[in-house]
């Protein structure tokens, strides 16, 4: 685990700590109409199962705002209300949810922000100042354009507004739709404030595009010690947002959990359908939370050398293969027996590691 994380002021969204020494939390956003409580609850359940820590819901009208009271009763995750344009919806939402997200570029005047702050103070819930490059307030957009400087100036201005109202229970996000502006904005603001950061690349695209952008922007920031909570925005399935986010946390050294998958690129030496087999192995063992390095190799030639540092490896040969544990061959089996035996061995190793951690 990396030890260079910037220590920020700690806030709480429900029972989830954000900032300070707290683990970096992941979140996503439902796409149902929030007033459709059954559909929204089903999506929140899916996110909970995927490993999300928090969930955000859109509040587009008064019906959505009023539905939050009932939704909060059944939500297994802390609930964040996402408010644009209509500050009065935030006043209603604050009575029920665990946090409010506002976009200072469209929420309105200082008086409206004060009303939202007062409502959040009363319920002791935090606010996210959600700055987006594409919707900056007029004075910052005209002066700086949709630049990192414009985003930072907007964030500082709004942070000062909240501080002047004696309110410091907030976090900040600075989102753009590309990697470089996102990184530069967070880097620029980090030394200037003590508040926790919500990381994200907005409108990042489909699974492929978003995974690349988010890994570069969020992963880069996390390795610099920047970031306290995060969302990977994907045009696609909810669960993928959490899956990719947790993978970024693992590979940036911020989360020691789950399997680190190692598999060779295909070449003329492979003796099996490696693409299908690697996918099959990963899917079958996706439930394991124990930190393990697991290798899936397409030939014995590579496996004996390249997989020797893995906790467990499988190597496919001509109608047979090897299972290697901590650098030593423990099974040579016919192809038909290889997969199930490998799964059992990995699950047993995970249990051994968990037991040793408890003893």
Swiss-Prot record:
Keyword match Oxidoreductase: yes
Function of the molecule: Converts 2C-methyl-D-erythritol 2,4-cyclodiphosphate (ME-2,4cPP) into 1-hydroxy-2-methyl-2-(E)-butenyl 4-diphosphate.
Organism taxonomic ancestry: Bacteria, Pseudomonadati, Campylobacterota, Epsilonproteobacteria, Campylobacterales
EC number: 1.17.7.3
Protein name listed in UniProt: 4-hydroxy-3-methylbut-2-en-1-yl diphosphate synthase (flavodoxin)
Annotated gene: ispG
Alphabetical keyword list: 4Fe-4S, Iron, Iron-sulfur, Isoprene biosynthesis, Metal-binding, Oxidoreductase
Organism field: Helicobacter pylori (strain G27)
Reactions that this protein is recorded to catalyse: (2E)-4-hydroxy-3-methylbut-2-enyl diphosphate + oxidized [flavodoxin] + H2O + 2 H(+) = 2-C-methyl-D-erythritol 2,4-cyclic diphosphate + reduced [flavodoxin]
Oxidoreductase is among the record's keywords: yes
SUPFAM superfamilies named among the record's database cross-references: Enolase C-terminal domain-like (SSF51604), Nitrite and sulphite reductase 4Fe-4S domain-like (SSF56014)
